[in-house]
Amino acid sequence: MSRVGKKPVTVPSGVTASVEGQTVKVKGPKGQLQFVVHDDVDVKLENGEVTVKPRYETNRARALYGTARAQVANLVEGVTKGFEKKLEITGVGYRATLQGKNLQLALGYSHDVVYTIPEGIAITVPKPTEINIVGIDSQVVGQVAAEIRSYRPPEPYKGKGVRYANEFIFRKEGKKK
């Protein structure tokens, strides 16, 4: 059994949660999110807490209910605090600029990479080598950060590229003479 799944998700004041069938809807000060839970998982809202339990005693249901509980907890955290990912750009001439709804990245290619910012995501560039991604849906924030990082992932020899702010790059030694 999942230790994460056993804990109920408390709904703080200022946040309203509702369960309609397999859909969990959460509305808070930062916005509104919803998540459709798998059919093998049972979700209930009682006394300001969302509880998640496996509907059947199958391996699949036991595997899914901890994930479903974590998703519901992310919904509640997203509408109250929001999520943020920070990226750092390392390399000579590598930089990022905002142009309206687009993020323009100079990453050493013959052309600039233009990334269109999706709805519900706010990107700021405090320095040309830093990118902050903020949003209420943790899955979308993580996906946007991963897509931007994928344009030039950090390489192990010089460490050039786009990396997460807390990411450690294992450096390799160059070839020897």
Curated annotation (Swiss-Prot):
The keyword Transport does not apply. Part of the 50S ribosomal subunit. GO terms for biological process: cytoplasmic translation. Keywords: Ribonucleoprotein, Ribosomal protein, RNA-binding, rRNA-binding. PROSITE patterns: RIBOSOMAL_L6_1. GO terms for cellular component: cytosolic large ribosomal subunit. This is Large ribosomal subunit protein uL6. GO terms for molecular function: rRNA binding; structural constituent of ribosome. The keyword Glycoprotein does not apply. Belongs to the universal ribosomal protein uL6 family. Pfam families: Ribosomal_L6 (PF00347).
